[in-house]
Amino acid sequence: MTSTSRAFVTILGLTAIFATAPATAHAVGTPENPWYFESMRTEEIWEHARGEGITVAVLDTGVDSSLPELQGQVLDGVDFTMDGSGAHVDTDGHGTHMATLIAGTGKDGGIRGLAPGAKILPIRIFTGERGFFTAESAETWKEGIQYAVESGADIISLSSGKLDVIGNRGPLKEAVDTAIRAGVLFFASAGNEAEGQNEPHPPASLDGVVGIGAVTPEGERSSYSTYGPQVALAAPGNDVPWHCEGLDGPLCLHERGGTSSATALASASAALIWSQHPDWTKNQVLRVMLNTAERSDDQRRDDYTGYGIVRPDRVIVDGEGDPGDPDSPPIFRDYEARLSPPATPSPSPEPESDPAAGAESGADAEAASPAESSGNGSLPWLVGGGVVLLLVAVTGWTVWRRRA
C-alpha cells in the first residue's frame, strides 16, 4: 500500500505525569487501520470476541463521551478533581484518547479501538494541569481506585507512568491492595523516561500492578519506554491513532504515543480475552497473556519488554495459553499471599508452563520458556525466526512540542 504524504500539526501536549510523548508525522498503517490491527489479526479476533461484558476503568483526565466513536461506550463514572466538571469532561484529551484506543467503535470515521465491545468507566482524577501529587491528592487516587472496584470494573487502566506522591504513597498502595483482593486486573504505564533518569515510579512499580512498556512497529522497545523489573508486558506505543488537532480534529498517527497508549492496548487485549472466557479469573487472564506474549529471542524475560508483546490473537484465534490454577497468580505470588485477607490461597507449585514463580517485587520473576508462535499471524518483524525491519515509507514533516 502506498503511503500518502501528510503534513501534521503540533498536537496538544500533555503534562509530565502522562506517559505520552510528543507527536510527530510518521506513516505506518493508517489511522483507520493502524499497524497492530494486522499484526494482531484484529478482524479475526472480532469474529470470536469484541470485549462484551467487560468494564475497563480509565483513571485519567476524564472521557469526552460526545465523540462519535465513544457514544454508547462510556458509563457514568465519577469526577474526583477539584474542578468538579464531571467524568465526561476532558479539557486535556489524554483520557479520551485512551478510551478510544480501548473501546472506540470507529463511528463516523472515528478511532477504532481494539475491544469495541467493552465499556469504559471514566474516573477523573486529574485535569492534566499538574506534574506532581501531594499526600492529599494521593487520597484522591485511593478514592478513584476504590470507586473502580466498588463499581464492578474488571480491569483498571492507568496511563500515568510517573506519579510522584510527595510524602505518602500509603493510600495508593492501600488502594492497589483493595483492587487485587477484589480480583481486578490492574495495568499501568511503565513511563517515558528511558532517555533520561529511567527511574521506576508508582503505580507501575507497586506490587500487584502489571507494568506496561511500549514497542515500535519493528518490535523494538520504544526509545522512551522506561525499563526495569517493573515491566511485565509490552504493547504498541508508536504510530497509534489520534485526534491531532484537538478532540474535534481529524485523525492522524501519533508516532510516539507512549506507554500510555501501550497500557490502553494491553488493557484492551485483556478485555478481549476475558470476554471470550468470562469464567476466568484475573490470574488466568494474565497467565495466558504472559505465556503467549511475542518474543524475538529465547529469553524468558527481560527488563525492556517483560515477558513480551501482547498477542491476544494467539489466545482467542489459536486457542494457545494454559489458564492454569484460577487461584494462583502467575506473578506477585508472595505479595498476594501477604495481603490480609489474602487475595489468593498460599502459593503452591505450578506446572513448568507457568510464566513466573514467586515474584516478590515487580514483574521480574523466574519464567518458563517464551511462547512459540503457532505460525499464524506472526508479528511483521518476526520472519523465519529472525528479526527483520518493516519496509516503511516515511513522509511528512516531523513536529515536536513539549509542554513545560
Segments predicted by a language model, with ranges:
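Hydrolase catalytic cores
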Residues: 99-102, 125, 238-310
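Loop/turn elements at helix/coil->beta-strand transitions in domains of secreted/extracellular proteins
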Residues: 52-55, 117-119, 150-156, 181-186, ...
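C-terminal subdomain of the subtilisin-like protease fold in secreted/lumenal serine endopeptidases
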Residues: 157, 277-381
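Substrate-binding/access-modulating region of protease and related hydrolase catalytic domains
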Residues: 128-202, 251-256, 261
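Subtilisin-like serine protease catalytic core
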Residues: 46-56, 63-76, 86-135, 220, ...
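Protease zymogen maturation seam
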Residues: 2-54, 68-69
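Active-site-adjacent substrate-recognition loops and nearby beta-strands
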Residues: 189-208, 213-230, 242-257, 298-305
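C-terminal membrane-anchoring or membrane-association module
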Residues: 380-404
